[in-house]
Amino acid sequence: MIKLRLKRFGKKREASFRLVACNSTSRRDGRPLQELGFYNPRTKETRLDTEALRLRLSQGAQPTDAVRSLLEKGGLLEKTIRPAELIGKSKQEELRKSEAKTSAKNKKANEEKANEEKVEESETLEASSEA
């Protein structure tokens, strides 16, 4: 299977990446089939060979997550919601709902406690005024 991935090069702590097409079983910095672009995360510079990328994608090459995000930013791929993101979003919605319920319960409990304290204070005041 052909993968579109980032190949690291540059100095230590000054990494840049080449976007390459390579066999999925080859090493990260091994010899690629084709170089398709360049990405520098420090300067946010990106150069993509759009024709070659479209050709590789039409042939069935699978981009890695990092490459997919670069291609989405470059407009070569439509932004897709992956199943993991859907699961994360649904869990977040469930958490928000449960937090809202618990906060509502806590508010009610606090109000009831405050009302009970007021009733107890008024009873003690009445008892002290009668005595």
Curated annotation (Swiss-Prot):
Keyword 4Fe-4S on entry: no
Pfam families reported in the protein's UniProt record: Ribosomal_S16
SUPFAM superfamilies assigned: Ribosomal protein S16
Compositionally biased intervals (Basic and acidic residues): 87-117
Listed InterPro entries: Ribosomal_bS16, Ribosomal_bS16_CS, Ribosomal_bS16_dom_sf
GO cellular component, one term: cytoplasm
Taxonomic superkingdom: Bacteria
GO biological process, one term: translation
Keyword terms: Ribonucleoprotein, Ribosomal protein
Region (Disordered): 87-131
Gene Ontology molecular function, alphabetical: structural constituent of ribosome
Family: Belongs to the bacterial ribosomal protein bS16 family.
Protein name (database record): Small ribosomal subunit protein bS16
Native source organism of the sequence: Prochlorococcus marinus (strain SARG / CCMP1375 / SS120)
Lineage: Bacteria, Bacillati, Cyanobacteriota, Cyanophyceae, Synechococcales
